Amino acid sequence: LMGQTWSTFMDLASLPDSLDFIGNTDGAIFARQAQVRYTYGGWQFALENPETTVTPNTGGARIVTDDNSVPDVVVKYHHADSWGSLAVAVMARQLAIESGGMDDNTNGYAVSFSGKYNVSATDDIRFTINSGEGLGRYIGLNTSNDAVLDAAGKLDAIKVTGYALAYKHAWADKWRSSLIYSAQHIDNDAQLTGLAVTDNTSSYAVNLIY
């Protein structure tokens, strides 16, 4: 595959049955971008768009850079069976900035474990757990940036952990509901980011779909 599509690091099967396409916004991996991907059975190997989002030292408007010299590298294994599916993915990234006299890069990494378990022919449980340093723009609609600048203009990767759980139940042939919970925890260094940043987000949702 060559082109723009959902990130290989993302597991579409684990997204909840929701009126909102994402549904589990806080903890979900959600990115659509240019990439080159090779698939062999359940394995996927991808080189993806390496854009970096940065928090200025002590806070301020987000800086978006495309100064990376290497793409984001993703390796994923996905297994599907009659009982549901599981996916495990790892990602390695270069975070970089070259602007206003600043020229620095650092490494980022992330892991993801997600899946869907069929409780019955109509009911299922869906989950995702994602964690890493420099994961920011991939998770929770970029609630946290990938990195923050220190006083010397050097990048410091920000650690983020997100998770979500959803249960779908069918009441009748045309009626179904989902109970959804998701959360994200951001390990900000307040001495670098300032205090006007988000440390945690969470959400609950219940729906009835006809």
What are these regions (language model features)?
Residues 1-56, 67-85, 116-119, 124-131:
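Outer membrane beta-barrel
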Residues 31, 201-202:
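Aromatic/hydrophobic pocket-lining residues that form the small-molecule binding cavity
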Residues 36, 75, 111-113, 165, ...:
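Membrane-embedded beta-strands of outer-membrane beta-barrel proteins
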Residues 80-201:
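Detector for outer-membrane/organellar transmembrane beta-barrel domains
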